[in-house]
């Protein structure tokens, strides 16, 4: 067995053993650089996942602005994946990506719903990512 083959097999085994995660991106876009916030959130989420051995199986985007997560097509896809048992972790940049601070009860409801299905919510933004657990209310 060559060294390259051994390395490929090791990577494949690590991917099989890692926890499946969905990266959820819902950010307000700047008028001057509309894709910058989205790219930053996605890059940060992928870095977060890689550093923790999580396997991002899908990236889901929603436009920012709708406070009720259940009215967002992307968030409903997150719920669908959680219900099916396809993911163990939802990665978001910060809590307001799920629901804005003024609607925190909606965020807490969604986090509880995910937790009941064995799914963790993890924040990729550096000041919040230091904790091993997401927000639990």
Indicate residue ranges for each PLM-predicted region.
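Short, structured surface patches at the beginning of a domain
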Residues: 1-137
């Amino acid at each position: 067995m060559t060294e390259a083959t051994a390395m490929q097999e090791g990577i494949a085994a690590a991917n099989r053993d890692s926890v499946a995660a969905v990266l959820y991106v819902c950010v307000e876009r700047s008028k001057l650089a509309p894709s910058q916030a989205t790219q930053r959130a996605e890059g940060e989420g992928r870095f977060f996942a890689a550093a923790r051995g999580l396997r991002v199986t899908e990236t889901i985007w929603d436009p920012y602005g709708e406070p009720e997560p259940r009215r967002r097509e992307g968030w409903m896809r997150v719920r669908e994946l959680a219900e099916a048992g396809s993911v163990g972790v939802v990665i978001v940049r910060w809590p307001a990506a799920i629901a804005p601070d003024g609607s925190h009860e909606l965020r807490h409801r969604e986090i509880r719903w995910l937790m009941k299905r064995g799914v963790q919510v993890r924040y990729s933004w550096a000041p919040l990512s230091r904790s091993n657990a997401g927000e639990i209310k």
